[in-house]
Every structure is written in structure tokens, then in C-alpha cells.
């Protein structure tokens, strides 16, 4: 909706940087006595069209002519039902030139990092179907993390059908969006030194589907050696929306093709049909309803290639990394407010488990759905709509985000990774813009932290108060400290305020807020244990994470 520095216009640099990818010219972003150079729309892969459509990305050739990198590249083709949140896409989405990335690098030499600054690579969210790196005002982004002595890279990757088509077999294993992200990380390894970054000190961070992508990248043998630290924000590989079994995802794509008129039988015919369709057809989901359970439609799958083993085995064998992960206080608040199907709240609390716990997930869906509903309405006056809406918000946040994030923290710690766990609980009550009147109460919601991390308001233009600026300073310091030192407390911290995550106290976490940040012992009022029990016994979760099935019986 608008960054806090979106009213400023950068100066275009006439001098070219002789980068190893090819010469580039970028923008000059001025912040008092600090200059940040920004290079927008740098191609990292050949256009994924023609014979390269629905294929793994191919590295772009080094160029010799100066490339003007003054503007973001086009967004990848958008799909899905979140347009009311994401708003109109700028620039216009397209297939041809969408695989680009952006680099923001402080101009002056670092006094601390002689071999190049630490690098932070951001992966945007949007349900694997929407959004782009261009959603973040470049001037605003340049005024956040890059002022903390790090180089920031943001990327585009293929979305929806174009990013995640699979036939469930060798004809089209899929996961092209994840292969795109991996190729972008390889670009960083090869070329970031030209931009003042250290390829041996890379942190990947992402939010929502970008957070799930970040965690998935830390597991795959194709990507996990390309970075040292990672920050999955409000999304991990363990979240409900992160990944599906290949046969279930293939069923969705067959159903979607049949919805648009496909009548073939085998995978080759299905793949050929997809190759022949226009972007307009493949991005049109209006009227389509999937038969497979889950919040999102076109998502990664456990393909046997990018993910050759179940997630727990991959986590166990992956090189040990430092992980920082967390959620906002009320992840589900905006989801509940924006979806008219969830009103009144009692209807929402009935429909929600029906969409999540189907026969493809648990063997006793009716029983699980009933238990889920009764757990969240326990002790609540059903005639009190405000109290019921709060429970709906809790249920949405717990199911889609809160349980998956703490499960990832536990799983990572179990396998020897150093973890820092947090909740983000600060909110400016005037930050919701047009959605203000739809909110039953105000709290930090899904995407709230992006205002303070990247300078961009998702629900309204970010016009920071003095208090907002203090929260931004705290947030960017914590995240950049982790990227630089592997410790959000900073270099050589002796009296650590933010403790490392411990399996002995699994709910203990760091609360980021204002005026005080502090460690807390209870995570979301202890509600998560109930959902962990369901997930621990569900066929879907057990198959994806552990490679085995176990029917849920509570």
C-alpha cells in the first residue's frame, strides 16, 4: 500500500558498475550521510517461455552492454484469490521477463566487514500465487536493513500454475518456483561480491509463503549449501499451506485442467495441454474448487527431486545452520476480517476445520472437525460475537501459522540447529487503512512486521510515528544482528537478552514489542499442544515430515 519513503525519487547513476554478471547502472538512495546503491530488475534466468515454460530455470548469459537497472522487473504471472489484499500489480505481470532480482548495497566500504558485507536475501510471500519484489518501495527498503551494514537482495520467482505445476511423476515433477529461488541463490554466490557482499555469509529470509520457502530451501540438497542462516517469518515447512504430497498436488492440477476443458488421460497429454494454454487461462481460478484439503491451491510438492526424502530426514542430514523464526500476535485476525464466509464467527469456526481436515488428511474427518470446533468454543458464550470472533482469529492463526512455526523450531533444534524463537506483538492501531472498520479489535496481524523490517505498509501506507521509528530500529537491529553474527543480540553479547531456543522449555520465546522486549514462557496461551496432537497423528503431516502414515484418533 505504500512505503515510508515512497514520496522520494532516487537519482539515477550514470556510472556503470562492472559486475561479474555484466555492467549495470542503478539508483542512488540518500539517507543523511549514507548512500545506498540500488540495482533493480537484474535478470538471473532466461525468460521461462517457449521450450523453457514449466522447466527448471536456465542461467542467463553474461552480458557486455551496460544494462540500466533503474526499475523493478515485471511481476510473475499472478494467480489466486487474494487480490483484495495484494491490490493491483505494478509493473504488469508477465511470463517473459519476470525472473529478476534486486540488490541494495551501502556505497561506502564497511569498517567491520573487510571481505564484503553479510547478505540478506528476501523471498516475498503471497500464498505462492501472488505478489512480487516490486511490492516493496525501493527507496523505503533502502532505508531499512541496508543501513545496518548488510547487502539486501530481493527476488521474483514463478507463482501459481507457472511455479508449481506437477503431474506427480517424471513428466513434470514441478516445484519450478523453488528451483527459481535456488538459481537466484546461486547467482548470489557467483556475483554478489561485485556488489560488495560476502557470498560466505548469506542469510535467507522470507515471510508467509516466503517463510515456508525459506525453510524448504534449508532442507533441499539442491539449495541448502547456498546460505548459512535463515529466518522463516510467519511460515515454515511444517505449516499447513507449505507443501503437499505429489499425488495430491497432481490431482489438483488435473482437476484444474478439467475445469478448463481438458479431457485427456495420461500425464503427457496433461503436460502438453498446460504448455499450450495462455497465461490468462492458467491464471483464471474463478469458479474452481479443489477437492484436496488445505488453505492454498498451487503449492510445492514432495516431488522426489527437489525433496528426495521426507522433511524430517532432510532436516537431520542437512548442514547445521542458525535459524530465527516467529509469528505475530494475531496471525489470523486479518484473515478472519477479510473473508465474508467466516461471518458470523460460529459459521467460520465450523467451516474452517471442514476445509482443513478432509479424508485426504485424516481417516476420521467428522470426529476431528467436531473436536476442533469444540476446543475453540469451549467456555465461550456463542451469542457473544466479539468473543467468538476472537476465538476464530486464534483458530486461524494457530492452524495456519503458529503451530507450524513452533514445530519447525522444535524440529530444527532436535537436529542440532541453533534456533531463536520470537513473537512480534507491536501494533500501531492506525495502520489498517480501509480495513480499520472491519477489525473486531487491533493487534499485530499477518504482515505487520514488514512495516518495521522493510519499510512497507501492506494494509495502508506506512507513515511512521516516532514510536514506529523506534520499533523499526529495534526490528532491523535484531534481524541484521542475526544475519551478521548469528545472534540477534549482537556481536560478542555477554548478557544475552534473547535466549537461544531450548527443547527443555519449548514455548519460551522472545516478545518483540514497545516499549519493552522480553522473554516469555507461554506461547499463545498453550493452545498449540492441541493442534500438535492432531498434526502428530494425521496422515498428511506424518507422510510429509516422516514418510509414514498414521490415522488421526484423538
From Swiss-Prot:
The keyword Glycosyltransferase does not apply. GO terms for cellular component: cytoplasm; plasma membrane. The active site is at residues 208, 331, 446. It comes from the Eukaryota. Coiled coil: none annotated. Its EC number is 3.1.1.1. InterPro entries: AB_hydrolase_fold (IPR029058), CarbesteraseB (IPR002018), Carboxylesterase_B_AS (IPR019826), CM06B1-like (IPR043187). CDD domains: Esterase_lipase (cd00312). It is a lipid-anchor. It holds the Pfam family COesterase. Disulfide bonds join 76-98. Its main location: cytoplasm. A lipid is attached at residue 2 (N-myristoyl glycine). Keywords: Cell membrane, Cytoplasm, Disulfide bond, Hydrolase, Lipoprotein, Membrane, Myristate, Serine esterase. It is found in: Cytoplasm; Cell membrane. GO terms for molecular function: carboxylesterase activity. The keyword Membrane applies. It catalyses: a carboxylic ester + H2O = an alcohol + a carboxylate + H(+). Belongs to the type-B carboxylesterase/lipase family. This is Esterase cest-33. The lineage of its organism: Eukaryota, Metazoa, Ecdysozoa, Nematoda, Chromadorea.
Amino acid at each position: 500500500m505504500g512505503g515510508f519513503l515512497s514520496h522520494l525519487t532516487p537519482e539515477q547513476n550514470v556510472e556503470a558498475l562492472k559486475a561479474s554478471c555484466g555492467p549495470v547502472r542503478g539508483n542512488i538512495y540518500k539517507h543523511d550521510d549514507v548512500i545506498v546503491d540500488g540495482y533493480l530488475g537484474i535478470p538471473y534466468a532466461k525468460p521461462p517461455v517457449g521450450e523453457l515454460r514449466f522447466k527448471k530455470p536456465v542461467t542467463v548469459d553474461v552480458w557486455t552492454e551496460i544494462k540500466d537497472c533503474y526499475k523493478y522487473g515485471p511481476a510473475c504471472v499472478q494467480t489466486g484469490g487474494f487480490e483484495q489484499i495484494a491490490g493491483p500489480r505494478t509493473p504488469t505481470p508477465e511470463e517473459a521477463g519476470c525472473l529478476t532480482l534486486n540488490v541494495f548495497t551501502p556505497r561506502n566500504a564497511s569498517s567491520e566487514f573487510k571481505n564484503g558485507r553479510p547478505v540478506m536475501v528476501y523471498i516475498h510471500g503471497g500464498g505462492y500465487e501472488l505478489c512480487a519484489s516490486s511490492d516493496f518501495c525501493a527507496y523505503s527498503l533502502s532505508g531499512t536493513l541496508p543501513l545496518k551494514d548488510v547487502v539486501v537482495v530481493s527476488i521474483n520467482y514463478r507463482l501459481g500454475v507457472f511455479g508449481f505445476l506437477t503431474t506427480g511423476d517424471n513428466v513434470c515433477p514441478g516445484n519450478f518456483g523453488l528451483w527459481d529461488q535456488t538459481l537466484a541463490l546461486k547467482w548470489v554466490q557467483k556475483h554478489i561480491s561485485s556488489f560488495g557482499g560476502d557470498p560466505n555469509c548469506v542469510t535467507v529470509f522470507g515471510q508467509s509463503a516466503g517463510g515456508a520457502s525459506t525453510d524448504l530451501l534449508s532442507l533441499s540438497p539442491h539449495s541448502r549449501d547456498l546460505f548459512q542462516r535463515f529466518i522463516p517469518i510467519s511460515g515454515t515447512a511444517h505449516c499447513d499451506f507449505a507443501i503437499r504430497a505429489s499425488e495430491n498436488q497432481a490431482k489438483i492440477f488435473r482437476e484444474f485442467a478439467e475445469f478448463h476443458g481438458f479431457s485427456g488421460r495420461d500425464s503427457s497429454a496433461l503436460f502438453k495441454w498446460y504448455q499450450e494454454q495462455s497465461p490468462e487461462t492458467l491464471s483464471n481460478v474463478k469458479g474452481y474448487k479443489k477437492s484436496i484439503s488445505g488453505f492454498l491451491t498451487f503449492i510445492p510438492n514432495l516431488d522426489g527431486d527437489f525433496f528426495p526424502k521426507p522433511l524430517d530426514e532432510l532436516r537431520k542430514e542437512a548442514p547445521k545452520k542458525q535459524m530465527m523464526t516467529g509469528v505475530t500476535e494475531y496471525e489470523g485476525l486479518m484473515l478472519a476480517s477479510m473473508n465474508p464466509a467466516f461471518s458470523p464467527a460460529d459459521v467460520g469456526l465450523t467451516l474452517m476445520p471442514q476445509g482443513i481436515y478432509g479424508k485426504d488428511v485424516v481417516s476420521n474427518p467428522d470426529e476431528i472437525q467436531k473436536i476442533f470446533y469444540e476446543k475453540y468454543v469451549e467456555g465461550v458464550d456463542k451469542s457473544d460475537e466479539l468473543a467468538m470472533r476472537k476465538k476464530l482469529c486464534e483458530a486461524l492463526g494457530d492452524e495456519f501459522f503458529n503451530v507450524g512455526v513452533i514445530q519447525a523450531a522444535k524440529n530444527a533444534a532436535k537436529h542440532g540447529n541453533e534456533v531463536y524463537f520470537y513473537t512480534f506483538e507491536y501494533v500501531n492501531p492506525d495502520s489498517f487503512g480501509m480495513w480499520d472498520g472491519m477489525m473486531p479489535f487491533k493487534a499485530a496481524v499477518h504482515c505487520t512486521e514488514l512495516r518495521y523490517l522493510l519499510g512497507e505498509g501492506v494494509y495502508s501506507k506506512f507513515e511512521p510515528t516516532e514510536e514506529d521509528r523506534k520499533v523499526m530500529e529495534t526490528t532491523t537491529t535484531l534481524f541484521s544482528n542475526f544475519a551478521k553474527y548469528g545472534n540477534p543480540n549482537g556481536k560478542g553479547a555477554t548478557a544475552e537478552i534473547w535466549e537461544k531456543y531450548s527443547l527443555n522449555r519449548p514455548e519460551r520465546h522472545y516478545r518483540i514489542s514497545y516499549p519493552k522486549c522480553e522473554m516469555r514462557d507461554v506461547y499463545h496461551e498453550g493452545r498449540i499442544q492441541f493442534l500438535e496432537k492432531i498434526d502428530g497423528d494425521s496422515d498428511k503431516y506424518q507422510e510429509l515430515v516422516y514418510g509414514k502414515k498414521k490415522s488421526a484418533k484423538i
